[in-house]
A protein has these predicted regions:
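Ligand-binding pockets and gating/stacking loops
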Residues: 1-459
Length: 459
């Protein structure tokens, strides 16, 4: 089934082209023309591309972008009010082991963990009043990625792919990179659900440096391109006959398109992912680490018209530091900080920054109090956390919203995940209430029945 294409480039490969055509069930309706074709947004958007830097596991806001001096005063003591209920038992206040400093003309305070990123703070809008719904990874990941933590819904990238189409038909419009395997709930994070299957994310394991492994199985080495073309034309005719008999079958249509995409990718994919084509000084700028490679690939994909690129910190939930937070956050942030700064610099130098909307953050934050019994980590915190936006029409050098004096709960200008999505869609040129898809008798949208634009972060 086409939904399995979200498993990676290999799942859109040509090697097994004829193996399972007869298994495709005609169970959907409302087929449409090529869903990847370029489309106009509701109005002129500021951004053409989205890059989502996902710190999966939940980074601590009070150790990164939300300084709380009160935690120093109360370190090792109970908070004046009772701790909010989270997933696990928590105890006394826990100060940040990291120093904050003011950066840029805006003077926004950022932790030393992201000192290099903070050199761009005048181009960044920090939202310190994010909030979600529950302190659990799975529903919070679904909410951040799909706009609903309970029901299967299309991912944000799928909505963008559906709404705008792709600028390059030789590459997927939505690419997901996660080094070392899948994050929690795996391909559900980038699914298309009831949207056309061609809109879903295409996954690759960015731990691989060998191109043939990174984008495996898009070639059938047993056939020439001409033979593949003839085979593909035959399969397309058979699929079209199958579709005619059943009137409407969007998954089948998407499957046809996925075969076509795999064929076209043979001419461009290897070149797009080949970092040896970059000059040495650019490779040095990004560094040799995994996140540097991912972000350099991302810049190359943006140049080639890919709409939505999502980059994960790693398999599982790397930022989920219930203990050993100081050591783990330091390692994780160090791996990200330099490459993020390099990426922002590179985009600006190439004139891509203003058309690329960048989101940094996790599915939730962490408590300002220590988790019991270890006292060296923090529990999940959905009541108040931070993210930041940059590029693509974002007003830089601003802080929006605030948590309480300890960083536990959003208290000033709270921003729900639906509000974040509405704002990002607006920057892409969409009225979030009008970007809908009819399914099961009702119109669905990414922001469900809520969401308001955070205009304070828009330039």
């Amino acid at each position: 089934m086409l939904q399995r294409c979200g498993m990676g480039f290999g799942m859109v490969g040509l090697a097994g082209l004829l193996a399972d055509e007869g298994r495709l069930a005609a169970q959907e309706s409302d087929s449409a023309p090529d869903p990847s074709a370029p489309k106009r947004s509701h109005f002129q958007g500021r951004a053409k591309h989205v890059v989502h830097l996902f710190m999966n596991g939940g980074p601590s806001q009070v150790d990164t972008f939300d300084p709380k001096p009160k935690l120093d005063e109360y370190h090792g003591k109970p908070l004046p009010s009772s701790n909010l209920r989270t997933e696990r038992k928590t105890g006394a206040a826990m100060r940040s082991p990291f120093q904050f400093a003011k950066y840029g003309q805006s003077g926004i305070e950022v932790s030393e963990l992201f000192a290099k990123t903070a050199s761009h703070i005048d181009d960044i809008a920090v939202i310190r009043s994010m909030h979600a719904e529950v302190p659990n990874h799975e529903p919070s990941l679904m909410l951040m990625n799909c706009g609903d933590g309970r029901q299967p819904r299309p991912s944000f990238g799928a909505w963008v792919n559906y709404g705008l189409g792709t600028e390059n038909r030789n590459l997927p419009g939505f690419i997901v990179m996660c080094p070392g395997g899948y994050p929690i709930v795996a391909t559900q994070n980038w699914r298309s659900s009831f949207l056309p299957g061609a809109c879903q994310g295409t996954y690759l394991d960015s731990n691989h440096t060998d191109i043939d492994k990174l984008i495996a199985n898009i070639r059938n080495t047993k056939l020439t391109l001409e033979e593949q073309r003839r085979q593909l034309d035959l399969v397309k005719k058979l699929n079209e006959l199958h579709a005619e008999e059943r009137q409407h079958a969007p998954l089948l249509e998407a499957r046809i398109q996925s075969f076509e995409l795999a064929y076209r990718m043979q001419s461009e994919a290897a070149e797009a992912f080949d970092l040896n084509r970059e000059p040495q000084h650019i490779r040095d700028l990004y560094g040799s680490g995994t996140h540097g490679r991912q972000l350099l690939i991302t810049r190359r994909l943006i140049e080639r018209g890919v709409r939505f690129i999502q980059i994960w910190s790693g398999a599982g939930q790397p930022w989920d530091n219930h203990d050993g937070l100081q050591t783990q956050h330091l390692k994780l942030a160090t791996d990200w900080d330099g490459p993020i700064a390099a990426f922002l610099t590179d985009l600006k130098q190439r004139g891509l920054f203003d058309e690329t909307l960048i989101l940094w953050g996790g599915e939730f934050g962490r408590t300002p109090v220590a988790e019991l019994p270890g006292l060296s980590g923090r529990d999940h915190n959905h009541y108040g956390f931070s993210c930041w936006l940059a590029g693509g029409g974002v007003k830089g050098g601003v802080v929006h919203g605030a948590t309480d004096e300890f960083g536990f709960q959003a208290v000033e200008n709270p921003v729900h995940v639906h509000d974040l999505h509405a704002t990002m869609l607006h920057l892409l040129g969409f009225d979030h209430e009008r970007l809908t898809y009819r399914y099961a008798g009702r119109d669905f949208r990414l922001t469900d029945v809520s969401g308001k634009i955070v205009r304070e972060v828009i330039a």
